[in-house]
Structure formats: C-alpha cells, structure tokens
C-alpha cells in the first residue's frame, strides 16, 4: 500500500521547537478546521451513498493539509453519481449541528424559526411519503401537478431563500469578526416540489382521469355534490330577496297590466290636471270606450267602417282591371281606325285609277275584237307559230297600246286555244292542261282532281277548316285570298266593276253580269267554236 500513498504536501512542514509555543493557538485552530472538514466529507459521502470502504482513502488529514481541495475531488465523484454540477463548499459546524445546545454560537430568532420550520417540513414530507408507499395504487385518484402548484412552490421557495439571505446578512452584521473565520453555507439546489404545508387535494382535470370503478363512483358523487350546492345557492338567493324589492316588482307588474285596461289620463297626466281640463278627460274616456268596444267585438260604427274598408279593398283590383281593359280597347280602336283610313285612302286611289282606265279598257276591247280575225288568219297560215308580231303591230297606235306592247314584249308564248300569252313555256304547258282536261293533282280527302297544285291546296282548306287569310278590320278569316280581297271592298267601298250603259258599279264581276241580264236584257255571249280537247306532251313545250 506504500505505492498508493500520495506525496507529502508542501504546506505540511514540521514546525520548529522554538515556534511551537508561539504558534500553538494557530495549530489548534488549524486542527479544528481539519476536523470540521472531515465531518463535512463524511456527511456528504453518506448523503451521496458512497461505499464505506472508500472513506479511509477519500480523506486522511495527515496526507492533505488544506480542506479546500476536497470539494474539487468530491465534484468528480458527484458527476459520476449523476448529481448536478453545483459548486459546493465545506459546511460549517453550524450547518451540521441541528440542536441549539450542541452549537458553539447563537443565531437570531428569525434564523432559529426558519431552521425549525425546515426541520418540521422535512419530517412531515417523510411521513407523507411513507404513508403514500403504504397506500395501494389507485389510478383514479392520482394527482397531477399543474402550473398553479408549480407557481405556488416557486413562491414558497423564493420566500424561503429570501428569508435565508436576509437572516445571513443580519448575522454578518451582528458578528462581523465571526463571519470572516466561519465558512459560508453550501449552495443547495432548489426543490420546487417542497412546500411549507401539505397540499390539499385538488380537483383533477378531465385529461388525467383513468377509468376505474373508483373513478366512476367519485364522478357520480362529485356530480351529486355539485347539484346539491347549486340547489342550496338557488334557495339562498330566493330567501335573500328583499321584501321591499319584491313588493316593488309586484307593483310594477300590476301597474303595467292596469295601464292596458285604464284610460290614458291615468298615466299621461296628473289627477289635478285631469280635473281641471274636463273636456280632455271626456275625450279620453270616449277614446277608451271606443277602444274597449273595438277590443270587445268591433261593434257599432267600427264594424261598418271595417266592412266599407274591406269592400273598397276588394273592389280596387276589379277597378284596375276595368281601367286596363278600357285602355286596351281604346288602343285597338285607334289601330283599327288608322288601318281603316289607310284602306279607304288606298280604295280611293284605286277607284280614281279605274275611272281613268275605263275608256282605255273599252278601246282595248274594241281593238281585240278587230284583231281576232287577223289572228285567226295568221294561225291558219302558221299553225305551229306562237309569236304575236301581228298583235304587237296592231297595238302600236296609241300610248296605252305602246305601254301594253312593252308589257307584252316579253311574252313570247301564246296559247292556241284562247290566245293567252305567257313568258315561260312551263307556264304555257300548265295552262294547256285546262284545255286537255288533264288533272294530275287529286284531293286526298274527296278524290277531286285539279289542274294545278295551288288549286288542290286551296280545295283542301274546305276539308281541314283552315282559314289562313284574316281581315285586319273585323278579324274575319277566309280560306282563299280572293275571298279576302272581295271582302275588303266592303270596308273600303271600292267597286271596280261598272256598267257602261248606266252609272252603277259593283264589287264583284258576277254582280255586274247579273245586272246586265236583268236590267239591260243582255244575253250571255255564246261562243261559236267549242273548245277543243287536246293532249299536250312535255316535248311540245
């Protein structure tokens, strides 16, 4: 074991015999410091749970003269054990001695009280831990430290630290000389979980409740207690209502009900003013009477007024409809009058034109009778010719004949049977179907046949009842346009067919023929030559 012993310290020099007497007091003080340091090391080792066999090696007063090196040595062992690295100094004898009789010095009353409170807290904490270990684990009653608890613990620890610092400063002020020799107390870590008094059981939050039969029972009991508390509070509030306040509320309620059943004067004006102004009071009473009668059943004049009002309300939409109908009729009359005026103007213009054209028509008829023998002679000489050069030469005598020549100059295709001329050969071939008695268009309803498709279509209107041609004046409808033209002559008064023997004129040609037969005894013209029936092929056109 000799190789394990450290070298001697340079500070531990043997004193001379001459200086033993002088430095006796100093040596005694030094040995006391070493003994106190040894006690401190032993206490710290016991607190850190070091092995007992290492204690002789950890500290030997003969090897190290200064106790200031021991905190550095113990610091490494503390880190190995997992404790925080906090600077530590050897404890003074005052920190080791717990009893007042064992101390060599006296403390202030505040310091004494503080030490006593700390001892009591430690004892109560140990007892509480022992009881907690003995109790069975119940997950439903496990407490959870909240922010309020930590804040409260921090406040208690800060107050303890401040009291300690204040007491230490007072001790230094009272004993300035002893504070120089005695080492300061070590720095201890603050325990945030410690408190001066045992914490009361707090209500847990909803997040840390674990289901168990005990927790369910506790929950139901807590709900029952809360319901009982709320009922007690409600009963207390009802009993605590001031009777004066209750009476005031009752009076206000009755006043509001009576205001609906009493005259206005009871609330609007004082009684003195109502007595002075009797007329106003009478008017108010009448108003109240009418109001009560109205609320009772709308009797008397009010019922009549109400019925009149409802009748007017119901008649308003009918009046509006009548006004709209009258306006529409006026607009239609105006439109029909304007259309009638236009038709009358057109009829007058046509009548004047016909009066001017009648002598020209008579001249044209005379010329036509004169041209018939010439045309017959020309047809005998040229049976296949359809040209009308002879007719054009004979009609160039007058201005009207010149205009007619211009109109007929484009008509180069003439019928051999009746002398009609056409612009196109297709039109002539369709016209020849009349003379040949060929009817290729039958009616799908009755089987009647027609020469032209337009005639067949007009005939089908009789079966279908369709009348597409409508009069703009009287809105009468017709199946054929010719009938509409004849009908319009009634509204305009236009009579295009006039008798050359008298001054009478007619709207239809049939009426003119009947007039001649009855009045002037004219026989209908008898044709000497009967129309020939011939078949015309499409190649002849």
UniProtKB/Swiss-Prot annotation:
Subcellular localization, as worded in the UniProt entry: Nucleus
Task: List the signal peptide residues.
Answer: none
Q: Where does tissue-level expression of this protein occur? A: Almost exclusively restricted to precursors and early differentiating cells of the embryonic PNS. Expressed in the R8 photoreceptor during third instar eye development beginning within the morphogenetic furrow of the eye imaginal disk.
Under InterPro entries, the record lists: Znf_C2H2_sf (IPR036236), Znf_C2H2_type (IPR013087)
| Record's compositionally biased regions (Low complexity) | 157-169, 194-206, 355-383
Gene Ontology cellular-component annotations: chromatin; nucleus
The record's Gene Ontology biological-process terms are:
axon guidance; chaeta morphogenesis; compound eye photoreceptor development; negative regulation of apoptotic process; negative regulation of transcription by RNA polymerase II; Notch signaling pathway; peripheral nervous system development; photoreceptor cell differentiation
Biased composition range(s): Basic and acidic residues: 141-155, 518-533
Q: Compositional bias of type Pro residues: which residue ranges?
A: 1-10
One term of GO molecular function: DNA-binding transcription factor activity
User: What keywords does the record list, in alphabetical order?
Assistant: Developmental protein, DNA-binding, Metal-binding, Notch signaling pathway, Nucleus, Repeat, Sensory transduction, Transcription, Transcription regulation, Vision, Zinc, Zinc-finger
Q: What does this protein do?
A: Transcription factor both necessary and sufficient for proper development of most cell types of the embryonic and adult peripheral nervous system (PNS). Essential component of the proneural Notch signaling pathway required for proper sensory organ precursor (SOP) differentiation. Correct expression requires expression of scalloped (sd). Repression of rough (ro) in R8 photoreceptor is an essential mechanism of R8 cell fate determination.
Which protein, by its recorded name, is this? Answer: Zinc finger protein sens
Q: Which organism is it from?
A: Drosophila melanogaster
Question: Lineage in the entry?
Answer: Eukaryota, Metazoa, Ecdysozoa, Arthropoda, Hexapoda
């Amino acid at each position: 074991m000799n190789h394990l012993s450290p070298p001697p310290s340079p500070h531990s020099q043997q004193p001379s015999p001459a200086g033993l007497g002088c430095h006796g007091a100093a040596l005694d003080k030094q040995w006391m410091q070493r003994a106190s340091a040894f006690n401190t090391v032993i206490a710290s080792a016991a607190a850190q749970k070091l092995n007992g066999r290492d204690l002789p090696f950890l500290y030997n007063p003969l090897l190290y003269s200064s106790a200031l090196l021991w905190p550095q040595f113990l610091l490494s062992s503390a880190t190995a054990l997992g404790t925080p690295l906090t600077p530590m100094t050897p404890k003074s004898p005052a920190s080791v001695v717990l009893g007042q009789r064992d101390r060599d010095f006296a403390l202030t009353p505040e310091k004494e009280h503080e030490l006593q409170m700390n001892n009591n807290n430690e004892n109560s904490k140990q007892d509480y831990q022992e009881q907690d270990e003995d109790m069975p684990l119940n997950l439903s009653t496990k407490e959870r430290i909240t922010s309020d608890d930590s804040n409260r613990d921090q406040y208690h620890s800060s107050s303890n630290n401040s009291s300690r610092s204040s007491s230490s400063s007072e001790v230094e002020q009272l004993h300035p000389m002893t504070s120089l020799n005695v080492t300061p107390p070590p720095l201890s870590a603050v325990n945030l979980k410690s408190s001066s008094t045992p914490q009361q059981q707090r209500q847990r939050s909803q997040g840390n409740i674990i289901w168990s039969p005990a927790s369910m029972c506790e929950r139901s009991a807590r709900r029952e207690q809360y319901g009982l508390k709320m009922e007690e509070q409600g009963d207390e509030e009802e009993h605590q209502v001031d009777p004066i306040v209750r009476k005031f509320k009752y009076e206000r309620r009755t006043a509001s009900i009576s205001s609906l059943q009493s005259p206005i004067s009871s609330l609007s004006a004082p009684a003195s003013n109502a007595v002075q102004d009797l007329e106003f009071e009478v008017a108010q009473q009448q108003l109240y009477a009418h109001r009560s009668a109205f609320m009772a059943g709308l009797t008397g004049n009010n019922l009549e007024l109400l019925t009149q009002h409802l009748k007017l309300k119901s008649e308003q939409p009918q009046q509006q409809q009548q006004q709209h109908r009258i306006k529409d009729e006026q607009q239609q009359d105006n439109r029909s009058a304007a259309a009638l005026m236009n038709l009358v103007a057109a009829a007058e213009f046509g009548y004047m034109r016909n009066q001017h054209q009648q002598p020209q028509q008579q001249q044209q008829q005379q010329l036509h009778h004169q041209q018939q023998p010439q045309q017959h002679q020309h047809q005998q000489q040229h049976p296949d010719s359809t040209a009308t050069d002879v007719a054009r030469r004979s009609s160039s005598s007058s201005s009207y004949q010149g205009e007619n020549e211009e109109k007929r100059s484009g008509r180069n295709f003439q019928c051999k049977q009746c002398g009609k001329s056409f612009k196109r050969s297709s039109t002539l071939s369709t016209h020849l179907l009349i003379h040949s008695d060929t009817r290729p268009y039958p009616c799908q309803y009755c089987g009647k046949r027609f020469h032209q498709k337009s005639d067949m279509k007009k005939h089908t209107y009789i079966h279908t009842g369709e009348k597409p041609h409508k009069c703009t004046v009287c809105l009468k409808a017709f199946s054929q346009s010719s009938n509409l033209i004849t009908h319009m002559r009634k509204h305009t008064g236009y009579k295009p067919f006039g008798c050359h023997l008298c001054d009478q004129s007619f709207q239809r040609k049939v009426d003119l023929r009947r007039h001649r037969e009855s009045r002037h005894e004219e026989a209908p013209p008898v044709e000497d030559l009967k129309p020939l029936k011939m078949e015309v092929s499409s190649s002849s056109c």
